[in-house]
Amino acid sequence: MKDKKDIKLNIFETALEIYSENPTKFSVRAVAKELNLKREEVYTHFPSKNAILRYFYQLCFEEYIKQTVEISEYSNYSLEEKLGHLVYTHIELFQNEKEFVERSFNEIIYKANPNNVFQKSLEEQVEKILN
């Protein structure tokens, strides 16, 4: 049996495929149908369809943090190097899903509530870099 994180990732990956093929066909129902799940099962992992899409941006921060932990000399990086690593890591990750980011970033992140997970994560990471 898959653990919660694996199920959540599977839901996200399926949603990403559906959204990338045709954003107008993207819905919790479509994701659930594709995975042979009940909609309620999808909602136990994500409160809304936009939350599924925002998960991509959360995963980007998780990958960034993982990379910083793996860099043994990261604590010795200058401010410029740390900020550069933050920016370039995200550019690289965004480039991997360029079409998705181009379609979703404006609505899901930029125009979203200023307290969304992406913006909070960005603020946390910049604060860590500055301190």
Give names to the regions the model predicted.
Residues 52-63, 68, 104:
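Alpha-helical DNA-contacting segments of helix-turn-helix folds
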Residues 113-131:
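Amphipathic alpha-helical packing segments from all-alpha helical-bundle domains
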Residues 10, 18-55:
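Helix-turn-helix
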